[in-house]
């Protein structure tokens, strides 16, 4: 059963589990569980997608309860009226506040993007980050005898595919557990020493104007058990 974070007569938001596809996809034709279908069965009515989260990413995922509301909300996303914030655990010490303004060329997936144009120019991509916590762990990762990590807040300003993951790789602080853009040695160290295998990227907050009431709505999502375990092992509290 999905954790419902917000629900009214027009919208419903859930805390998407890591590893779960938002909807049926040829990315994995053998998968049988999807957020959309599970939520539909759970609340007893159809839901309409507004935005998406990558399969390995957890956190706030918003759906509309009608196609009309979905269209109104999609306009807010397109016009950048929606504010999103993420938490990520990254390699190394990343402190302070900075903006990453680095255009990204779409990395086409052989399956998901099989019909997409291959020669697209790099697209504008902007991410703000803020370092929140740091830690050094007494086990080796690659050529280093210790492993350093940072907890960071990430705020995307453009909706590019894998933008946060690609931007963190660009600044040499890849997200822990990222099998596509991450550090293989760091991922192995996390798994062997801490038993952590997921992508440590979590959509913790989503703010928007309600399409009917015009109220400012902010929805937050708590961390799952594996995140909580990692935070405890790193001694990161009161985040």
Swiss-Prot record:
Any one Gene Ontology molecular-function term assigned to this protein's record: RNA binding
EC number, UniProt record: 5.4.99.26
Catalysed transformations (reactions): uridine(65) in tRNA = pseudouridine(65) in tRNA
Signal peptide: none
Keyword tRNA processing set for record: yes
Record keywords, A-Z: Isomerase, tRNA processing
Positions annotated as active site in the UniProt record: 54
Entry-linked InterPro entries: PsdUridine_synth_cat_dom_sf (IPR020103), PsdUridine_synth_RluA-like_CS (IPR006224), PsdUridine_synth_RsuA/RluA (IPR006145), RluA_PseudoU_synthase (IPR050188)
GO aspect biological process, one term: enzyme-directed rRNA pseudouridine synthesis
Keyword tRNA processing: yes
Cross-referenced Gene3D superfamilies: Pseudouridine synthase (3.30.2350.10)
Transmembrane segments: none
Pfam families in the record: PseudoU_synth_2
SUPFAM superfamilies: Pseudouridine synthase (SSF55120)
PANTHER family named among the record's database cross-references: MITOCHONDRIAL RNA PSEUDOURIDINE SYNTHASE, TRNA PSEUDOURIDINE SYNTHASE C
Protein purpose: Responsible for synthesis of pseudouridine from uracil-65 in transfer RNAs.
Family: Belongs to the pseudouridine synthase RluA family.
Protein name: tRNA pseudouridine synthase C
């Amino acid at each position: 059963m999905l954790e419902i974070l917000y629900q009214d007569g027009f919208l419903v938001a859930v805390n998407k589990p890591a590893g779960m596809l938002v909807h049926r996809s040829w990315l994995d034709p053998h998968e049988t569980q999807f957020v959309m279908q599970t939520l539909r069965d759970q609340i007893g009515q159809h839901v309409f997608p507004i935005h998406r989260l990558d399969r390995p990413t957890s956190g706030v995922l918003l759906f509309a309860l009608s196609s009309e509301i979905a269209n109104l909300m999609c306009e807010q996303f397109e016009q950048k009226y929606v504010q999103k914030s993420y938490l990520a655990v990254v390699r190394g010490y990343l402190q302070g506040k900075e903006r990453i303004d680095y255009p990204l060329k779409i990395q086409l997936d052989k399956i998901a993007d099989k019909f997409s144009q291959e020669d697209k120019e790099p697209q504008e991509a902007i991410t703000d980050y803020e370092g929140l916590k740091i830690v050094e762990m007494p086990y080796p990762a690659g050529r280093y005898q210790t492993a350093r990590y940072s907890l960071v807040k990430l705020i995307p300003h453009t909706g590019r595919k894998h933008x946060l993951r690609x931007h963190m790789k660009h600044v040499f602080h890849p997200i822990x557990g990222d099998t596509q853009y991450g550090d293989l040695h760091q991922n192995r160290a996390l798994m062997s020493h801490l038993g952590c295998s997921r992508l440590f990227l979590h959509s913790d907050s989503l703010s928007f104007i309600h399409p009917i009431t015009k109220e400012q709505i902010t929805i937050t999502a708590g961390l799952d058990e594996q995140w909580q375990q990692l935070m405890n092992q790193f001694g990161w509290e009161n985040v």
